[in-house]
Amino acid sequence: VEIPGVGSTTFLKTAVNAIRKHRGEKEFDAMEFLKIMREKRDELGISEEMMRRALNVGFSGGEKKRNEVLQMALLEPYLAVLDETDSGLDIDALRVAADGINSLRSPERTMIVITHYQRLLEYVVPDYVHVMADGKVVRSGGKELALELEEKGYSGVGDKAEAAA
Protein backbone atom coordinates (compact mmCIF):
# COMPACT_ATOMS: atom_id res chain seq x y z
CA VAL A 1 0.00 0.00 0.00
CA GLU A 2 1.37 3.40 -0.97
CA ILE A 3 1.11 6.05 1.76
CA PRO A 4 1.99 9.49 0.36
CA GLY A 5 3.35 11.92 2.93
CA VAL A 6 4.58 9.24 5.34
CA GLY A 7 8.31 8.68 5.15
CA SER A 8 9.52 5.09 5.15
CA THR A 9 11.99 5.69 7.98
CA THR A 10 9.41 7.56 10.09
CA PHE A 11 6.89 4.76 9.57
CA LEU A 12 9.40 2.08 10.58
CA LYS A 13 10.62 3.96 13.67
CA THR A 14 7.04 4.52 14.84
CA ALA A 15 6.13 0.86 14.27
CA VAL A 16 9.27 -0.48 15.96
CA ASN A 17 8.78 1.75 19.01
CA ALA A 18 5.11 0.77 19.29
CA ILE A 19 6.13 -2.90 19.38
CA ARG A 20 8.94 -2.22 21.88
CA LYS A 21 6.54 -0.29 24.13
CA HIS A 22 3.99 -3.11 23.94
CA ARG A 23 6.69 -5.61 24.94
CA GLY A 24 7.77 -3.44 27.88
CA GLU A 25 11.09 -2.56 26.22
CA LYS A 26 12.73 0.86 26.06
CA GLU A 27 11.85 2.79 22.92
CA PHE A 28 14.69 3.69 20.55
CA ASP A 29 15.71 7.30 20.19
CA ALA A 30 16.34 8.54 16.65
CA MET A 31 20.07 7.74 16.64
CA GLU A 32 19.63 4.22 18.04
CA PHE A 33 16.92 3.45 15.52
CA LEU A 34 18.88 4.83 12.55
CA LYS A 35 21.90 2.70 13.47
CA ILE A 36 19.85 -0.50 13.63
CA MET A 37 17.81 0.38 10.54
CA ARG A 38 20.96 1.07 8.49
CA GLU A 39 22.47 -2.29 9.48
CA LYS A 40 19.32 -4.18 8.45
CA ARG A 41 18.89 -2.04 5.32
CA ASP A 42 22.46 -2.74 4.20
CA GLU A 43 22.05 -6.49 4.81
CA LEU A 44 19.03 -6.46 2.48
CA GLY A 45 20.62 -4.29 -0.21
CA ILE A 46 18.17 -1.43 0.29
CA SER A 47 19.43 1.99 -0.75
CA GLU A 48 19.46 5.00 1.53
CA GLU A 49 17.56 6.86 -1.20
CA MET A 50 14.71 4.36 -1.01
CA MET A 51 14.33 5.00 2.72
CA ARG A 52 13.99 8.75 2.09
CA ARG A 53 10.90 8.23 -0.06
CA ALA A 54 7.30 8.12 1.11
CA LEU A 55 6.20 4.64 2.16
CA ASN A 56 5.96 2.40 -0.93
CA VAL A 57 5.31 5.42 -3.20
CA GLY A 58 6.85 4.72 -6.58
CA PHE A 59 8.48 1.51 -5.32
CA SER A 60 9.02 -1.26 -7.84
CA GLY A 61 7.67 -4.70 -7.00
CA GLY A 62 11.13 -5.78 -5.86
CA GLU A 63 11.54 -2.69 -3.68
CA LYS A 64 8.19 -3.36 -2.02
CA LYS A 65 9.20 -6.94 -1.27
CA ARG A 66 12.56 -5.84 0.14
CA ASN A 67 10.78 -3.25 2.26
CA GLU A 68 8.44 -5.95 3.61
CA VAL A 69 11.42 -8.08 4.65
CA LEU A 70 13.05 -4.99 6.24
CA GLN A 71 9.87 -4.38 8.22
CA MET A 72 9.92 -7.97 9.42
CA ALA A 73 13.61 -7.72 10.36
CA LEU A 74 13.00 -4.57 12.39
CA LEU A 75 9.67 -5.54 13.97
CA GLU A 76 10.82 -9.06 14.93
CA PRO A 77 7.29 -10.50 14.95
CA TYR A 78 6.39 -13.76 16.66
CA LEU A 79 4.21 -14.63 13.65
CA ALA A 80 4.82 -13.49 10.08
CA VAL A 81 2.58 -14.25 7.11
CA LEU A 82 4.50 -13.81 3.86
CA ASP A 83 2.03 -13.85 1.00
CA GLU A 84 3.73 -14.55 -2.34
CA THR A 85 6.97 -12.88 -1.31
CA ASP A 86 8.54 -14.25 -4.50
CA SER A 87 6.00 -12.62 -6.82
CA GLY A 88 7.59 -10.27 -9.34
CA LEU A 89 11.15 -10.71 -8.10
CA ASP A 90 14.14 -11.27 -10.33
CA ILE A 91 16.63 -13.89 -9.18
CA ASP A 92 18.89 -11.40 -7.36
CA ALA A 93 15.99 -9.81 -5.47
CA LEU A 94 14.65 -13.28 -4.66
CA ARG A 95 17.96 -14.27 -3.09
CA VAL A 96 18.06 -11.08 -1.01
CA ALA A 97 14.50 -11.68 0.21
CA ALA A 98 15.25 -15.34 0.95
CA ASP A 99 18.42 -14.42 2.86
CA GLY A 100 16.37 -11.97 4.91
CA ILE A 101 13.73 -14.59 5.65
CA ASN A 102 16.34 -17.19 6.57
CA SER A 103 18.17 -14.77 8.86
CA LEU A 104 14.95 -14.31 10.84
CA ARG A 105 14.23 -18.01 11.35
CA SER A 106 14.20 -18.98 15.01
CA PRO A 107 12.35 -21.30 17.37
CA GLU A 108 10.57 -18.21 18.78
CA ARG A 109 9.13 -17.17 15.41
CA THR A 110 6.54 -18.78 13.16
CA MET A 111 6.54 -17.90 9.48
CA ILE A 112 3.79 -18.86 7.10
CA VAL A 113 5.15 -18.54 3.58
CA ILE A 114 2.50 -18.61 0.87
CA THR A 115 3.79 -19.37 -2.62
CA HIS A 116 2.65 -21.07 -5.78
CA TYR A 117 6.13 -21.77 -7.05
CA GLN A 118 9.06 -23.97 -6.10
CA ARG A 119 11.55 -21.19 -6.90
CA LEU A 120 11.44 -19.54 -3.45
CA LEU A 121 11.70 -22.92 -1.74
CA GLU A 122 15.10 -23.46 -3.36
CA TYR A 123 16.37 -20.76 -0.99
CA VAL A 124 13.94 -20.98 1.95
CA VAL A 125 13.61 -24.66 2.88
CA PRO A 126 10.25 -25.21 4.59
CA ASP A 127 9.76 -27.24 7.75
CA TYR A 128 6.24 -28.15 6.61
CA VAL A 129 4.26 -27.86 3.38
CA HIS A 130 0.48 -27.65 3.32
CA VAL A 131 -1.71 -27.76 0.22
CA MET A 132 -4.98 -25.86 0.51
CA ALA A 133 -8.16 -26.18 -1.53
CA ASP A 134 -11.46 -24.45 -0.82
CA GLY A 135 -10.05 -22.95 2.37
CA LYS A 136 -9.00 -26.32 3.83
CA VAL A 137 -5.70 -28.10 4.18
CA VAL A 138 -6.02 -31.15 1.92
CA ARG A 139 -2.49 -32.48 2.19
CA SER A 140 0.53 -31.91 4.43
CA GLY A 141 4.09 -33.06 4.33
CA GLY A 142 7.70 -31.99 4.33
CA LYS A 143 9.73 -30.23 1.66
CA GLU A 144 9.32 -33.34 -0.50
CA LEU A 145 5.66 -32.42 -1.01
CA ALA A 146 6.71 -29.11 -2.61
CA LEU A 147 8.99 -31.01 -4.98
CA GLU A 148 6.18 -33.43 -5.83
CA LEU A 149 3.84 -30.51 -6.57
CA GLU A 150 6.42 -28.94 -8.86
CA GLU A 151 6.88 -32.21 -10.73
CA LYS A 152 3.29 -33.48 -10.92
CA GLY A 153 1.11 -30.42 -10.36
CA TYR A 154 -1.88 -30.36 -8.06
CA SER A 155 -3.65 -33.14 -9.94
CA GLY A 156 -0.71 -35.40 -9.23
CA VAL A 157 -1.09 -35.16 -5.47
CA GLY A 158 -4.68 -36.30 -5.18
CA ASP A 159 -8.25 -35.47 -6.14
CA LYS A 160 -8.86 -32.96 -3.35
CA ALA A 161 -5.64 -31.10 -4.10
CA GLU A 162 -6.66 -30.80 -7.75
CA ALA A 163 -9.16 -28.09 -6.80
CA ALA A 164 -6.28 -25.88 -5.65
CA ALA A 165 -4.86 -25.64 -9.17
Describe the role of every protein-language-model region.
Residues 90-95, 140:
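Conserved D-loop-proximal element of ABC-family nucleotide-binding domains
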Residues 128, 132, 136-159:
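Conserved beta-strand-loop-alpha-helix hinge in the C-terminal portion
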